[in-house]
């Protein structure tokens, strides 16, 4: 019962945390004349997640659920989650993204949270169900008041075992919704967001 109450409380936090982003962006909009500077990477090989060091007894999954601040707070509150780190996933291989580039909508990156969890405490099934409980899987490129390609929902997995679990739970969720636009893909690359987003 405590877990359910905590999840419901966190849904409220998720819903309200992202509103602050809209207000902040409206107060300090990026000028129309501003163009993001692209940082070119010499190769196009898959980066995956160079900032993550695998730990014994810990697994990892990546959730894009709109604004990453609310998702990060939600995941951090779940027992068995060791860490939730905001970042950017699966965009153009040619750039190392910054927040300004991602919000421009030109990079293909999604605001994403890397969730490091202990499967002997919390199952991936439970995390995926919690994820689907807080998103609207029927809306592309938006969640709540946050609109843009960076807010596209998605689950990005790092191995076949996670893929099988994600696909199984997603099949259940697809039956509940006539329209379903959540990306289910392997992780191609992930970069941690700037420190002020953590």
Question: Model regions: which residues?
Answer:
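Bacterial N-terminal signal peptides
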Residues: 6-15
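Flexible coil/turn and secondary-structure edge motifs
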Residues: 18-198
């Amino acid at each position: 019962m405590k877990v359910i109450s905590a999840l419901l409380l966190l849904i409220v936090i998720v819903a309200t945390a992202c509103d602050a982003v809209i207000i902040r962006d409206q107060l300090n909009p990026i000028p129309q004349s501003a163009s993001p500077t692209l940082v070119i990477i010499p190769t196009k090989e898959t980066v995956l997640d160079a900032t993550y060091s695998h730990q014994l007894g810990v697994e990892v999954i990546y959730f894009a659920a709109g604004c990453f601040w609310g998702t990060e707070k939600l995941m951090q509150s779940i027992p068995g989650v060791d860490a939730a780190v905001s970042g950017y996933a699966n965009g153009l291989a040619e750039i190392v993204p910054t927040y300004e580039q991602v919000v421009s909508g030109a990079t293909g990156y999604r605001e994403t949270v890397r969730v490091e969890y202990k499967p002997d405490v919390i199952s991936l099934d439970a995390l995926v169900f919690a994820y689907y409980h807080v998103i609207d899987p029927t809306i592309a490129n938006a969640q709540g008041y946050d609109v843009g390609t960076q807010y596209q929902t998605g689950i990005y997995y790092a191995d076949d075992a996670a893929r099988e679990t994600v696909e199984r739970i997603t099949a259940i969720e697809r039956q509940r919704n006539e329209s379903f636009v959540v990306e289910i893909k392997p992780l191609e690359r992930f970069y941690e967001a700037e420190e002020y987003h953590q």
